[in-house]
Amino acid sequence: MPLLLSAGGAMCALALLTAALMLLPDMLIGPTQWVTRTTANRTMDVTWRPSDGDVFAALPGQVRPPADDAPYAAFRIAWDTAGFRLPAEPHGAYPVAVFGDSFTEGFNVERPYSDGLADALGVGVRNYGYRAYGPVEVAQVAGEFAAAEPRQWVLWGYFSGNDLGDAVRGPRIDARSPVAAWRALFDRLRPPSPTPTAPPDESGAPRYNQPLPVIIGGSYYDLAFVSYYAWWQQTPPDAASSRNADVVRAALDAFDAALPPETCRAVVFIPPKERVYARYIVEGDRQFVNAANQRVVTSPGGTLTFAPAPVEDEAAYFDSLYAHRDLIAALLAERAGWRLIDLTPAFEAAAAEERLLYYPYDTHWNQAGHDLAAQVIAEAIKDGC
């Protein structure tokens, strides 16, 4: 009998804790939704080093650690009461607002492109970008903040490396599932796992796949690439009818519903580092990348996914990388009041001039990349809607 009572008590406690996990997931296991921001009213001093790059998490055990880990920059970031990055220079009004993901938030630079845009235009520019946001989260934030004050321009910084894929992802943690909730709790309590190590070569030394040697004219760079960001550039001809594209349309609808018709609207098309610099990878290493290439295809269920597609004709391959840009242009052509600001030509031209616009060990822009983006966007805005 005592054993039965003990077992019954344990089952009751387990049921209560499970209920608590599902009712209060954010408190017990952390944010469950991608839209949740954890930076409200925070100030942080950032020292950004090569080893802080996101490629080490994206490609565990595959990236050779940098020989020189001296800081790129040191700066301070502050976020407002809603968890969005505060402008470098406060203004009384913000007639321009930018939305997007980590490229827009600019966590790893002192001055994101929103600040450069404010300088170029001479007006306040509000930054509503946040890390890991996709079209669904951008739509939610647009509904709340796009018309928080009168706007002349509203911009969506659309990162072509993952926004289309993130359009159909599930929640960060599915708190509706007891199994998923318990797994998330165990993951939170478990000690950090050791960082995976690269397999040894014949001599026993680690064999790393990254970074890759890049030569542009007289300049040499070691750059780490995340290949699937390049894969997302090759969208299929029927991509506009995919579920992913429908979610992008819904995000555009959210902006339209929030804004008066006279507000100018634009999607800023942000190319990934892989799109801009992969053509300059040294030929032998580029052949390795080409052999492992995949491209986007439409699944029977209507979502976009990947399929192996080794590169046989490089010229045709590089031409195909404009497909994603063309898809977004087509979606914007379906509605009034929107224009496309494509950063690809300016970034390709700058790369050809041997300028490095992304961090070597990170997928994001360095300060030069943000500065160039601000310049291109400002010129487009000055041309009018």
Please provide the spans of the model-predicted regions:
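Membrane/wall-proximal cationic-aromatic binding patches
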Residues: I29-V123, E312, A316-Y322, D326-I328, ...
